[in-house]
């Protein structure tokens, strides 16, 4: 895979994300502007300028009309993608570590950090839309709900919405995950310990019925949303910063590497600065993609399953389009199952 290297940031990447159609790619970093790119050729569509601090998180709504960013400058901003204008700013008491639109596009969750004697919380903001055009007509100024860190849990580090926005799933700094029912006053349904270190990323399957978590403890887990049981575990030999589930193929892509603060003059191979592709079902590593010369901070796979993007500590974004060998790869047991199915169809 020959990557397209996107040079739009001067500082470490914090998040990369595709829109629902997969034609746009959003990137944000520790510098003060976010970028929007065409995912097919890596051409930059534009930048989102207006924050005064590092941008920790970015997300596009289901219509690709708006996107939201959360920043270390204590603000959440909503932007129109037609012209890159900021149309709403919510001020917060602490830095904002994660933002995400709900699947319906009417709510935004934001993780507020646990600093300056604040316990950390997940705030839910509401936006009102014109049902015909999907344009936002009103931004509700105050959060409609605040999930303050529960006793027995550390502050949330990552969070997202399950299918149809039924639950909010959060990963915490103590390695626990938790589930909140949005239809029952955002009550805590259950929580459990899955990692030994802070949960560094949480991404959902295409149908949002299960999700993958990863951590600096070098492990990633796939967890079912309804049962909250760990279905699969992927063990690596380096700390993980990001994990994504691929559509079309039964794979997961993991990324991380030696902590940036510990990197001195080690070679890229020693630092483990590569994306690892694991078989989702068999839990075995099947390939690696090298290229970054610092830890991988964020990985995203296009919803169509045709490309993936990684953002690194060195400020580079690498956009990879999968080749034929990726789609053709199968274990012997998968080939046998396909052959059996083919024979039964012919019969």
UniProtKB/Swiss-Prot annotation:
- Superkingdom per UniProt: Eukaryota
Query: Which InterPro entries does the protein's record reference?
Result: eIF3i (IPR027525), WD40/YVTN_repeat-like_dom_sf (IPR015943), WD40_repeat_dom_sf (IPR036322), WD40_rpt (IPR001680)
Query: What Pfam families does this protein's entry cite?
Result: EIF3I
Could you tell me where this protein is found in the cell? Cytoplasm
Keyword Transmembrane helix annotated: no
Query: What's in the keyword line of the UniProt record?
Result: Cytoplasm, Initiation factor, Protein biosynthesis, Repeat, WD repeat
GO function terms (MF aspect): RNA binding; translation initiation factor activity
- Gene Ontology biological process terms from the UniProt entry: formation of cytoplasmic translation initiation complex; translation reinitiation
Q: Name one GO cellular component term.
A: eukaryotic 43S preinitiation complex
The record's principal subcellular location, in a coarse class, is cytoplasm
* Cross-referenced Gene3D superfamilies: YVTN repeat-like/Quinoprotein amine dehydrogenase
The residues bearing each WD repeat, given as ranges, are: 8-49, 51-89, 149-190, 194-233, 291-330
Q: Identify its protein family.
A: Belongs to the eIF-3 subunit I family.
Q: What is the purpose of this protein?
A: Component of the eukaryotic translation initiation factor 3 (eIF-3) complex, which is involved in protein synthesis of a specialized repertoire of mRNAs and, together with other initiation factors, stimulates binding of mRNA and methionyl-tRNAi to the 40S ribosome. The eIF-3 complex specifically targets and initiates translation of a subset of mRNAs involved in cell proliferation.
Subunit description? Component of the eukaryotic translation initiation factor 3 (eIF-3) complex.
The protein's name in its UniProt record: Eukaryotic translation initiation factor 3 subunit I
């Amino acid at each position: 895979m020959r990557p397209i290297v996107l040079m739009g940031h001067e500082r470490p990447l914090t998040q990369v994300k595709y829109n629902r159609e997969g034609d746009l790619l959003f990137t944000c970093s520790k510098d003060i502007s976010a970028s929007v790119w065409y995912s097919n050729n890596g051409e930059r569509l534009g930048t989102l300028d207006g924050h005064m601090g590092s941008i920790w998180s970015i997300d596009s709504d289901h219509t690709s009309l708006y996107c939201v960013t959360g920043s270390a400058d204590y603000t959440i901003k909503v932007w129109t993608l037609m012209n890159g204008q900021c149309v709403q700013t919510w001020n917060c008491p602490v830095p904002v570590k994660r933002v995400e639109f709900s699947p319906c596009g009417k709510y935004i969750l934001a993780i507020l950090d646990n600093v300056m004697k604040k316990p950390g919380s997940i705030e839910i903001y509401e936006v009102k839309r014109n049902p015909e055009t999907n344009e936002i007509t009103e931004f509700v100024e105050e959060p409609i709900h605040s999930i303050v860190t529960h006793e027995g849990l550390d502050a949330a580090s990552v969070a997202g919405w399950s299918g149809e926005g039924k639950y909010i799933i959060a990963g915490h700094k103590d390695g626990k995950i938790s589930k909140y029912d949005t239809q029952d006053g955002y009550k805590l349904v259950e929580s459990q310990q899955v990692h030994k270190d802070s949960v560094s990323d949480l991404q959902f399957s295409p149908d949002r019925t299960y999700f993958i978590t990863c951590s600096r403890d070098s492990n990633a887990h796939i967890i079912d949303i309804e049962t909250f049981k760990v279905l699969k575990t992927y063990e690596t030999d380096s700390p993980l910063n990001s994990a994504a589930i691929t559509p079309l193929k039964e794979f997961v892509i993991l990324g991380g590497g030696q902590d940036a603060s510990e990197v001195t003059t080690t070679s890229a191979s020693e630092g483990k600065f590569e994306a690892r592709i694991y078989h989702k079902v068999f839990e075995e590593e099947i390939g690696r993609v090298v290229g970054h010369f610092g830890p991988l901070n964020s990985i995203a796979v296009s919803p169509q399953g045709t490309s993936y993007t990684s953002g690194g500590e060195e400020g580079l974004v690498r956009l990879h389009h999968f080749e034929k060998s990726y789609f053709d790869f199968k274990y012997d047991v998968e080939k046998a199952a396909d052959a059996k199915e083919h024979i039964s169809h012919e019969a």
